[in-house]
Amino acid sequence: MRIALCSYSQKEKETALLMKLGKVDRFDNGVFCVYAMQREGPYDAVVIMEDGARGMNFCMSIRGYSRDVQLLWISDQAEFEPQSRRLQADTFLVKPVTEYQLRE
């Protein structure tokens, strides 16, 4: 499984969990993730690990390019769940997340 991790900061714990699921490419900018998908084809999943407006910007970049890629937004702010639906994220999780939640 090819996974794109979109996050401005290094998230060691979450990255380690994702690496158990497949190959992880990390991007600190949603635009760079889109460029990678244009060059190398779509990812099986894009995981956004940013809160608030930063997370929303990542979602908008990814959804602006592809409505088909599986999009997971992980935030520590539960109040952004309605925005995740509006931005068509497939899944919204509140930190901390478990390996079990990521596998679902």
Regions found by a protein language model. Name each.
Residues 22-25, 41, 66:
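A structural signal for short coil/turn segments at secondary-structure junctions
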Residues 28-45:
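Acidic, metal-coordinating helix/loop segments flanking the phosphotransfer/catalytic sites
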Residues 14-22, 61-62, 86:
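Short, aromatic/basic amphipathic alpha-helical patches
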Residues 16-19, 35-36, 64, 104:
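Charged/polar, solvent-exposed surface patches and flexible loops
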Residues 1-18, 26, 46-47:
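Conserved acidic segment of CheY-like receiver
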Residues 43-104:
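CheY-like receiver
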Residues 26-29, 73:
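A structural preference for short, hydrophobic beta-strand core positions in alpha/beta folds
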Residues 9-10, 14-15, 33, 52, ...:
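Active-site-proximal cofactor/substrate-binding loop regions of enzyme domains
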